[in-house]
Design a protein with these regions (language model features):
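Active-site pre-lysine segment of PLP-dependent enzymes
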Residues: 1-19, 23-54
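PLP-dependent aminotransferase class I/II
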Residues: 46-123, 127-130
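Short acidic/glycine-enriched loop/turn segments that link adjacent beta-strands
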Residues: 61, 133, 166-169
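Short beta-strand-to-loop capping motifs
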Residues: 69, 139-143, 175-177
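Conserved PLP-binding catalytic core of the aspartate aminotransferase-like
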Residues: 112, 120-155, 171
Length: 193
């Protein structure tokens, strides 16, 4: 959603209702009208913005992230959070990762290029792709999503059926390296032919 759409929604929500905005894929987004987290945070006292180190920084196994909000909301959250809610290794890795601008830049460039490549290849194969701003593509075609998931797993390719998101015909694939994406496409062609 655009910044304007999000603000429109926020203006309809009572200030007593906590709104959580998950920006897990924020760094991947290249849409100019995407939400401006700093502007939103300073404007809405009931907004909690969450970020993770699992995506662009690649620290998924460390299970670490953070929240941004106005001071009063942070004070309330600090009263109810568990002590020692992240380990020191995860904290140290996160501190280093957030400063590694070169890694983030390279990851964004690789993802953008490979996402466009995958989107084009899937479209050329007759798939219907949902435009993506993240590190994944959701698509459907002339196949049963559950069967495709099972058959690709047998080939060593992990995709995700997204019926739980009320999209039973769609499969979601994570954007990988050039070699990973080419392997996925090769196996996809084998499975659907």
């Amino acid at each position: 959603n655009s910044h304007e759409e999000f603000e429109s929604m926020m203006n309809k929500i009572p200030s007593s209702v906590l709104v959580i905005l998950d920006l897990a894929y924020f760094e991947y987004v290249d849409a100019e009208d995407y939400v401006n987290a700093n502007e939103l945070m300073s404007k809405y006292s009931n907004l909690l913005i969450t970020k993770t180190f699992s995506k662009i920084q690649g620290l998924a196994s460390l299970r670490i992230g953070y929240g941004l909000a106005q001071p009063d909301l942070i004070a309330v959250l600090n009263k109810i959070r568990q002590p020692f809610n992240s380990n020191s290794l995860a904290q140290e890795a996160a501190c280093e990762a957030i400063l590694d601008e070169e890694h983030i830049k390279k990851s964004v460039e690789l993802n953008s290029y490979q996402r466009d490549f995958l989107h084009q290849q899937l479209t050329d194969m007759g798939m219907e792709c949902i435009p993506s701003q993240g590190n994944f593509i959701s698509f459907k075609g002339n196949f049963d999503a559950k069967d495709l998931f099972t058959n690709l797993m047998k080939q060593g390719v992990i995709v995700r059926p997204i019926a739980l998101y009320d999209m039973p015909e769609y499969i979601r694939v994570t954007v990988g390296t050039k070699d990973e994406n080419e392997y996925f496409l090769e196996k996809l062609k084998e499975v659907i032919s």
